[in-house]
A protein has these predicted regions:
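NTP/phosphate- and nucleic-acid-binding module
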Residues: 2-198, 207
Length: 207
């Protein structure tokens, strides 16, 4: 993302974007203490400020997003090599200028690695077995509700489907009637399900 600013105000906006982007990362729910800023001591020739937001992976702190004040390098070079005037008339100051750029850059691959490394858990069970559980924060869970009829008879699948119909416009809902209910709960644990509904418990609540 490139944010265009008035020359001379780029440091104010760079600081504002640092705070905004750090707040976004912390809102994911993995713990505020797992993030830090790493300001660059050596800057690229076009930059006058740069920092990375780093996340504490199992293998140490690594960058997940960069925030840079790129001065007028980008638009200035477009203007220079295109031969066309690229300036903004500022109605507040009555001046025309080449805007400075504050840029934030985040990669989907690193974010995916961050989410999976934080959420992936292997629980040890009795007998030496283990099971995979994905402990995603609620905001990131892809499925919010699973509806699981206890048996495939006595009208339970129909009741379960009514529950799905009531919820599907407000939540990401899955319906599962395959295998035992315990195995179905287990499958939902593996993808970080937030809520389940047993149709047997809800038959008295649904007409």
């Amino acid at each position: 993302m490139q944010f265009f600013v008035r020359p001379g105000e780029e440091m104010k906006w760079w600081q504002a974007w640092k705070e905004t982007r750090m707040a976004w990362h912390r809102a994911l729910g993995f713990g505020d203490d797992r993030y830090r800023f790493h300001d660059h001591e050596k800057l690229a020739h076009y930059a006058n400020a740069a920092t990375d937001i780093e996340y504490n992976f199992p293998f140490g702190f690594k960058e997940v997003e960069g925030i840079h004040s790129r001065t007028d390098f980008d638009l200035g070079n477009h203007q220079k090599f295109s031969g066309r005037k690229i300036q903004y008339f500022d109605p507040e100051t009555g001046e025309s200028y080449v805007p400075y750029v504050v840029e934030t850059s985040i990669g989907v691959d690193r974010m995916f690695l961050q989410v999976m490394s934080a959420a992936y858990t292997e629980e040890q069970l009795e007998g030496g077995d283990s099971r995979v559980v994905l402990r995603l924060p609620a905001a990131l869970a892809p499925v919010k509700v699973a509806v699981l009829p206890l048996v495939k008879k006595d009208g339970m699948p129909e009741v379960a489907q009514k529950i799905v119909d009531l919820l599907k416009y407000d939540y990401n809902v899955v319906y599962d009637e395959k295998d035992s209910v315990g195995k179905r709960y287990r499958r939902q644990d593996a993808v970080c399900l937030l809520y389940t509904s047993d149709a047997a418990d809800d038959m008295q609540c649904v007409d």
